[in-house]
C-alpha cells in the first residue's frame, strides 16, 4: 500500500471519529434542554386583569416536583401575599397557587422556584396588573 493511500485511510478514520464524537455530544446535551422552563401562565406576564383569578396557574416545559417547588404572589412593594404550590400527578408540568381575594388594584409579582424532574432548579418571576374596577 502506498503512503498516500495510508494517509487517506488515516484521515477518513479521523473524520469518522470526529463525526461520532460530535453526534455523542449533541445527543448527550439533549437532557440539559429538558429543564422545566415556564411555558404558560394564568395570568401571564404583563397581563392586565379586571379581577384577581382564584388560582394562579403555571405550566412548565417538563415535569416538576411539587413537594420541592414554591410559587408566591407579592404586592408591588415586595410583600408576600400568598406562598405555596399544588401539583397533581395527572398534570406533572403544572403548579397552582390559591390567590388571595380582595386585593387593591396595582402591580403584582409571581415568583417561582421549581425543582425539575431532571434534578435542576429553575427560578423566575413575572408581573401582572390588577386594574381598577370600572
Feature annotation, model-predicted:
Residues 99, 104-110:
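A glycine-anchored, Pro-Gly-centered beta-turn/N-cap motif
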Residues 34-52:
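N-terminal edge beta-strand
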Residues 57-58, 62-81:
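Short, surface-exposed alpha-helix to beta-strand junction/turn motifs within ectodomains of secreted
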Residues 29-31:
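N-terminal signal peptide c-region/cleavage motif recognized by signal peptidases
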Residues 91-97:
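Aromatic sugar-binding surface patches on proteins
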Residues 2-19:
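Bacterial N-terminal signal peptides that target proteins for export
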Residues 51, 55-62, 119-134:
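Extended, polar beta-sheet/loop recognition surfaces of beta-rich domains
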Amino acid at each position: 500500500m502506498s503512503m498516500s493511500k495510508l494517509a487517506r485511510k488515516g484521515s477518513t478514520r479521523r473524520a469518522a471519529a470526529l463525526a461520532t464524537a460530535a453526534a455523542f455530544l449533541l445527543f448527550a446535551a439533549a437532557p440539559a434542554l429538558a429543564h422545566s422552563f415556564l411555558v404558560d401562565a394564568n395570568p401571564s406576564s404583563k397581563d392586565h386583569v379586571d379581577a384577581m383569578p382564584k388560582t394562579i396557574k403555571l405550566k412548565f416545559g417538563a415535569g416538576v416536583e411539587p413537594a420541592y417547588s414554591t410559587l408566591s404572589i407579592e404586592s408591588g412593594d415586595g410583600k408576600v401575599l400568598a406562598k405555596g404550590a399544588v401539583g397533581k400527578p395527572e398534570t406533572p408540568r403544572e403548579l397552582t397557587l390559591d390567590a388571595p381575594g380582595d386585593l387593591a388594584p396595582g402591580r403584582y409579582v409571581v415568583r417561582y422556584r421549581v425543582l425539575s424532574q431532571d434534578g435542576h432548579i429553575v427560578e423566575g418571576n413575572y408581573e401582572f396588573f390588577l386594574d381598577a374596577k370600572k
